[in-house]
């Protein structure tokens, strides 16, 4: 219900001369999501591990959120081959999107998958990191895919829901298509 009015606002763009089609997203986000997580974990370890060494602290004693520590630990154990496989997965997604953008100018999708959460709903210090990860992934939608594949995107308010809540649509273009 939150996005139904925003979706109808997207279709109003047809009156401005745009062709609007409802299609399935061309990328399997579950596969690219795992690849992005592996890369993010590796970079998190690179940053946190470096700081831990500077402070002469074991990784477990770093004063950081539980979720950040878990990501750093996963990154610490990521092999070079696993990292390269993850990067190759994103390169393949980038290429698939380039093919997609031969036919379409932009993808328009919700910025978030649900209304803004109450403070604390996404607890970075949760002891249940599966729940944290599941909530994060379910809430953030496809936005990370645009970031991970280098697609230029902008969040545009498309509708106002009750109580005076702006609902955004994410307009995403081809890599290098910032002027689209």
Language model region names:
Residues 1-7, 11:
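Single conserved hydrophobic/aromatic residue that forms the stacking wall/gate
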Residues 15-27:
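Flexible, glycine/charged-enriched surface loops at secondary-structure junctions
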Residues 30-41, 123-125, 169-171:
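Short low-complexity, flexible loop/linker segments enriched in glycine and/or proline
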Residues 39-98, 110, 114, 155-165:
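Short helix-loop capping/hinge segments that flank enzyme active sites or metal/cofactor-binding pockets
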Residues 105-106:
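Short, Asp-centered acidic motifs that coordinate Mg2+ and/or phosphate
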Residues 117-139:
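Short, surface-exposed loop/helix-turn segments at secondary-structure junctions
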Residues 145-148:
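Conserved short alpha-helical elements in the N-terminal third of ANL/AMP-binding
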Residues 165-175:
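Short, well-ordered beta-strand elements
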């Amino acid at each position: 219900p939150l996005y139904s009015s925003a979706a109808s606002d997207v279709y109003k763009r047809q009156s401005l001369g745009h062709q609007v089609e409802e299609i399935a997203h061309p990328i399997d986000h579950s596969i690219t999501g795992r690849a992005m997580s592996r890369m993010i974990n590796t970079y998190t370890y690179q940053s946190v591990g470096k700081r831990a060494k500077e402070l002469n602290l074991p990784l477990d004693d770093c004063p950081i959120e539980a979720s950040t520590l878990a990501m750093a630990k996963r990154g610490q154990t990521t092999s070079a081959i696993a990292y390269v496989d993850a990067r190759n997965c994103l390169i393949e997604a980038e290429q698939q999107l380039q093919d997609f953008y031969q036919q379409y100018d932009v993808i328009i999708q919700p910025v978030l998958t649900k209304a803004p959460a109450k403070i604390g709903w996404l607890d970075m210090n949760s002891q249940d990191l599966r729940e944290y990860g599941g909530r994060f992934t379910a809430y953030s939608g496809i936005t990370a895919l645009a970031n991970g594949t280098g697609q230029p995107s902008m969040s545009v308010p498309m509708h106002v829901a009750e109580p005076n809540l702006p609902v955004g649509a994410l307009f995403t273009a081809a890599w290098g298509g910032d002027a689209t």
